[in-house]
From Swiss-Prot:
Family membership noted in the UniProt record: Belongs to the universal ribosomal protein uS15 family.
Gene Ontology biological process terms from the UniProt entry: translation
SUPFAM superfamilies in alphabetical order: S15/NS1 RNA-binding domain
Name of the protein described by the UniProt record: Small ribosomal subunit protein uS15
Function summary: One of the primary rRNA binding proteins, it binds directly to 16S rRNA where it helps nucleate assembly of the platform of the 30S subunit by binding and bridging several RNA helices of the 16S rRNA. Forms an intersubunit bridge (bridge B4) with the 23S rRNA of the 50S subunit in the ribosome.
Record-linked PANTHER family: RIBOSOMAL PROTEIN S15, BACTERIAL AND ORGANELLAR, SMALL RIBOSOMAL SUBUNIT PROTEIN US15M
Domain of life: Bacteria
Phylogenetic lineage: Bacteria, Bacillati, Actinomycetota, Actinomycetes, Frankiales
Organism: Frankia alni (strain DSM 45986 / CECT 9034 / ACN14a)
One Gene Ontology term, aspect cellular component: cytosolic small ribosomal subunit
Length: 89
């Protein structure tokens, strides 16, 4: 389930390091986190939707890889991001 363009723009403006930033790990992780939360809410209602559950697991893995990359390259940005998003590690 893709995000609406206005939601994407809001996330980009909130987490971008420079203007028109779409590829930084912070923006990517924030967008994945939003998609994960949307899918989690969907799965609370539709418990037997296993195709969406697999998609959720893929998104979580992608976010985990981006967070690992960020923690290895710049630990301060990583800590700030997980605190801002409310993720636990």
């Amino acid at each position: 389930m893709p995000l609406a363009s206005d939601v994407k723009q809001k996330i980009m403006s909130d987490y971008a390091t420079v203007e028109r930033d779409t590829g930084s790990p912070e923006v990517q992780v924030a967008m994945l986190t939003r998609r994960i939360s949307d899918l989690t809410e969907h799965l609370k209602v539709h418990k037997h939707d296993h195709h969406s559950r697999r998609g959720l697991l893929l998104l979580v893995g992608r976010r985990r890889r981006l967070l690992n990359y960020l923690s290895k390259t710049d630990i301060n940005r990583y800590r700030a991001l997980i605190e801002r998003l409310g993720l636990r590690r």
